[in-house]
């Protein structure tokens, strides 16, 4: 089983000289305004509905997605999350035959079908030449900060393929496996709100 490397922004610093809340947020990758936002009516509450059992799909079936979950970093499955907080997306797959160089990935789309963001395991495992026997199970694991989302509904797609980014066999692509419902937002512009590690106005020296 191969686990995607964690984004460097999720890594914990080993030495912090300034322990103020703003500096802690800057080091750990959390929005410096999180405490203020989450304590106000701007908190970006996101309800999560697991729709995997009802999702449409396609693919040749050499590997099949069996479960998709969104959890906290301790593995507790979530039915709601606050935008800007760290989450773990796990895509569990059963191999129906031998699979070489599997690629497991996801997308988050808005109600118009626009892909807001996504990722896969290809680059993480590029130099590993992975191969797994049929009958085994593997999981794609992704840890990231949930972006702040505008009000509305959003869906995750999940997929497992075999090969390379440009030339692959699509074993299983599952549509709309997780539904996100958002009622309140705090970001000011764009399709998604990225947690800001640091925001300031500084006086420049002449």
What positions do the PLM features span?
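Localized sequence-composition bias
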Residues: 1-206
